[in-house]
Amino acid sequence: LEFFRRRGAMLVLLFILLHKIGDTLANLTFRLLFDDMGYSNDEIAIYDIGIGFWAYLIGIFIGGILYARIGMKRSVLLSLILMGVSNLSFAALAALGKSNWGMAGAIGFENFASGIGGVTVVAYFSALCDLRFTAAQYALISAAASIVGRFLTGTTAGGLIEQFGYVDFYLFTTLAAMPGIALFWLMMRAGLIDASVGTAATDRTAQPPE
């Protein structure tokens, strides 16, 4: 209840619900795309582990640097944009056809963006917590962030692919990420990010955007 007494709390909750829609939809279909394009299980494993894993680790490292250098708000906004735009790489792969370089680029970019977001967005969610109720509030925030994803299944994504095709589907997932990005930007401009953070936020995260 303490969270909902903060200014802008309902908009923050709406952002938590919306911010992963595009990313979740896209992630449900990567294996289906790779199978339909003719990649073998061994090829998928090589790209996913050999490139995706390391790209994710690099993204985590860069995310930490961005958070420290440009602050919470701008680093979160940048990570949201990167995660949304990363879906375009799979639209390009689907349009290009089977390509080793295309596969490497798409998986690398997606995992790199996810690594950055894994640092900055989690840090933002942590900053929303009151130190008196950190465990309970973070658990509720994490649960809220996954609610929409529970309604988005492989069947849902598969139906959209059948209707639109892969290229248009990944363009759609990029558009689906836009409401979360726009909402966070509007909250930044209105000062609601600062107003909604809890006592777990640091002095750096409480500074207004430059």
Task: Write out the residue ranges for each language-model feature.
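Short amphipathic helix-loop junctions that connect adjacent transmembrane helices
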Residues: L28-A45
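Helix-to-loop junctions at the C-terminal end of transmembrane segments
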Residues: I58-S75, I161-E162
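C-terminal ends and interior cores of transmembrane alpha-helices
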Residues: I81-K98
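Intracellular juxtamembrane helix-capping segments at the cytosolic ends
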Residues: G115-D130, L140
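A late C-terminal transmembrane helix in Major Facilitator Superfamily
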Residues: L128, R132-Q163
